Swiss-Prot record:
Gene3D superfamilies, alphabetized: 3.30.1130.10
PANTHER family from the UniProt entry: DIHYDRONEOPTERIN ALDOLASE 1-RELATED (PTHR42844:SF1)
EC number: 4.1.2.25
Keyword annotations from UniProtKB, A to Z: Folate biosynthesis, Lyase
Pathway noted in the entry: Cofactor biosynthesis; tetrahydrofolate biosynthesis; 2-amino-4-hydroxy-6-hydroxymethyl-7,8-dihydropteridine diphosphate from 7,8-dihydroneopterin triphosphate: step 3/4
Binding-site positions, substrate: 23, 56, 75-76
Coiled coil: none
Record InterPro entries: Dihydroneopterin_aldolase, FolB_dom, GTP-CH-I_C/QueF
Single GO MF annotation: dihydroneopterin aldolase activity
ATP-binding listed as a keyword: no
Name this protein carries in UniProt: Probable dihydroneopterin aldolase
Family: Belongs to the DHNA family.
């Protein structure tokens, strides 16, 4: 059995995010990673046409638009909002979406790595 997956890893978006108003005052970097799963071989595998593919340039543009226009206190909320918009945009094209949102520089002393929240959804 063949499985098909498109991955976009660590797309940086500057967003208004944070628990306090002070934290949300200046845009902060978050990293968005995404895996799209396909039930069948994507048509673009045979045709080599962008029009038959999931255009990842359009997808990252959507991620940036949604993330920058939806200020959130928590990465959990941002992940849910992004997942819903991506699922709607790709209706009928994918069977599963895995999404991870990472706050690149959380304001916690001595925390040296990003904090992440992941969410996955099977798409009917």
């Amino acid at each position: 059995m063949l499985l098909y997956r498109l991955d976009i890893a660590d797309f940086r978006v500057w967003v208004s995010i944070g628990v306090s108003e002070q934290e949300r005052h200046y845009p902060q970097p978050v990293l968005v990673s995404l895996s799209l799963f396909f039930k069948e071989e994507p048509k673009a595998c045979s045709t080599d046409k962008v029009s038959d593919s999931v255009c990842y340039a359009e997808l990252v543009s959507l991620i940036e638009e949604v993330a920058t226009n939806n200020p959130c206190a928590l990465i959990e909320r941002l992940a849910k909002v992004l997942l819903e918009k991506i699922e709607k945009a790709l209706a009928g094209q994918v069977s599963r979406i895995d999404l991870r949102v990472s706050k690149e520089r959380p304001p916690i002393p001595d925390l040296l790595s990003p904090v992440s929240f992941s969410i996955s959804r099977e798409v009917p």
